Amino acid sequence: MSKKVKKYIVVESPAKAKTIKSILGNEYEVFASMGHIIDLPKSKFGVDLEKDFEPEFAVIKGKEKVVEKLKDLAKKGELLIASDMDREGEAIAWHIARVTNTLGRKNRIVFSEITPRVIREAVKNPREIDMKKVRAQLARRILDRIVGYSLSPVLWRNFKSNLSAGRVQSATLKLVCDREREILRFVPKKYHRITVNFDGLTAEIDVKEKKFFDAETLKEIQSIDELVVEEKKVSVKKFAPPEPFKTSTLQQEAYSKLGFSVSKTMMIAQQLYEGVETKDGHIAFITYMRTDSTRVSDYAKEEARNLITEVFGEEYVGSKRERRKSNAKIQDAHEAIRPTNVFMTPEEAGKYLNSDQKKLYELIWKRFLASQMKPSQYEETRFVLRTKDGKYRFKGTVLKKIFDGYEKVWKTERNTGEFPFEEGESVKPVVVKIEEQETKPKPRYTEGSLVKEMERLGIGRPSTYASTIKLLLNRGYIKKIRGYLYPTIVGSVVMDYLEKKYSDVVSVSFTAEMEKDLDEVEQGKKTDKIVLREFYESFSSVFDRNDRIVVDFPTNQKCSCGKEMRLSFGKYGFYLKCECGKTRSVKNDEIAVIDDGKIFLGRKDSESGSPDGRSVEGKGNLSEKRRKGKKGS
């Protein structure tokens, strides 16, 4: 009788290993590599430009024993590599296959959920490493190494600080700086918002654009106490259920509804995907959380329909939805983020999850269930009211719920009521409300809205949204105040340098085009070498490692002598200086934006439009004493 071959599965994390082990039992041993085992070296560039961008890989410090263990497992028996199904995971699998001399074998398994049905199917159908996906990931890694290893030392040398520059992070920083510049330039216009209230309903004056009325007109409008129904149109309006979550929409909704940062959302989602201990063993609660897709498997749809029928009735089950046109930026055919078992209700899950895990799971569970339900239906009444002489008109809309559909699960706020009047009928009394308001600029980004914009523009990927924003915050390039993101002095000065010298690196369109190129490498339409050559030719033509960044900007700050102060950078960091010799230090994280060569410190309140700059009058301090006699240092 032949000896039974031992079987091993390699995953990234212990939690994932434990969940898979609880499914497969003693049939397989499951080992965690703890993420990447090999990468470009930290101590040197690690890319041979003379050999067509050949990478020089090295075992990550502290992972030597992991590599030896993997080699040992490959010698002992059959080794299956089950790292994540995205590009990063494919690259990890490739490195593992290389060090274990198993490249070319069908030893790669992928899955979007860690459930018995899917895991058992995956181990039956191993495939070879997807080298197109690996090349796309290696190209991204080398591109980022070229940019980071070239530009970061320039920033270190000039600012004596652990700063960095990169393709995605710099393009994202540009979005925040550009928005602050828009707010700075915005000139508010006053206008009147005029409404009439009657029978608990509201209608707004009908004008082509927001306008400011003169006093005589306002007095005339204020005297209106009766209107006539000129037009009434009734129709049935359906509201389609939301799609199940993908990475970006989960991050946005968790930020909006739960107040979670995008990093916190991804950390908790990872825990729910990899598994949590329950009475039935280690169980995964959601599918893979880094995805561009809203696709749902037929199996999951059927499970959802069964639950909806059981709990709410067959009339709530959504029809087979027509597959929507796929987004050109979607990286591959992942599934949406959904519960692995829709019958695991949030109440039941709460027995095993901590508070934050339960909140996020409930959000995912409700969104998925709602996505498989019928649209909600309302009776929509659009009406027009006019004064008897026809001089002024007011328009309004009111909704009356007919069928709640998906809103049974996914609550939505709508303006509901009834319009009991008919055309020609008089509406009396009416109360006129006149409010003087100002136009407002676009709001500053929150973490959620920044992710939405990054996705819309094609900057980064689901796996990089959270880490990019976290990096910008950690570097001090941006600052979060009451949930809104502001550029700082250091962020604005670095961005000004990058925009002037490396406009392509920070260009949103260039960064998005580069992501498209990487997609084409993965699809086999382009080679990684061509993408790298094209980028390097452009980048190397402007790169100068000896660049000196001169910080000398006029500011919006006045000295006590009345003259404008300038921003400079010296031995002790950023500071303001005046011709009269007075100086004042400023913190790296003070809010600032550069516009037309001038740096504006403080912030402009987007609600009121009033400046919030801080005066520097009479602020002699320690840094002034340090710099005495060192003007212009």
From Swiss-Prot:
Its EC number is 5.6.2.1. Mg(2+) binds at residues 12, 84. The active site is at residue 288. Releases the supercoiling and torsional tension of DNA, which is introduced during the DNA replication and transcription, by transiently cleaving and rejoining one strand of the DNA duplex. Introduces a single-strand break via transesterification at a target site in duplex DNA. The scissile phosphodiester is attacked by the catalytic tyrosine of the enzyme, resulting in the formation of a DNA-(5'-phosphotyrosyl)-enzyme intermediate and the expulsion of a 3'-OH DNA strand. The free DNA strand then undergoes passage around the unbroken strand, thus removing DNA supercoils. Its cofactor is Mg(2+). It catalyses: ATP-independent breakage of single-stranded DNA, followed by passage and rejoining. It comes from Thermotoga maritima (strain ATCC 43589 / DSM 3109 / JCM 10099 / NBRC 100826 / MSB8). Monomer. It holds the Pfam family Toprim. One of its GO terms (biological process) is DNA topological change. This is DNA topoisomerase 1. The keyword Lyase does not apply. It is an enzyme of class 5 (isomerase). The keyword Transit peptide does not apply. Disulfide bonds join 559-578, 561-580. It comes from the Bacteria. Residues 6-115 form the Toprim domain. InterPro entries: Topo_IA, Topo_IA_2, Topo_IA_AS, Topo_IA_cen, Topo_IA_cen_sub1, Topo_IA_cen_sub2, Topo_IA_cen_sub3, Topo_IA_core_domain. Residues 601-633 are annotated as: Disordered. GO terms for molecular function: DNA binding; DNA topoisomerase type I (single strand cut, ATP-independent) activity; RNA topoisomerase activity; zinc ion binding. Keywords: Disulfide bond, DNA-binding, Isomerase, Magnesium, Metal-binding, Topoisomerase, Zinc, Zinc-finger. Residues 164-169 are annotated as: Interaction with DNA. CDD domains: TOP1Ac (cd00186), TOPRIM_TopoIA_TopoI (cd03363).
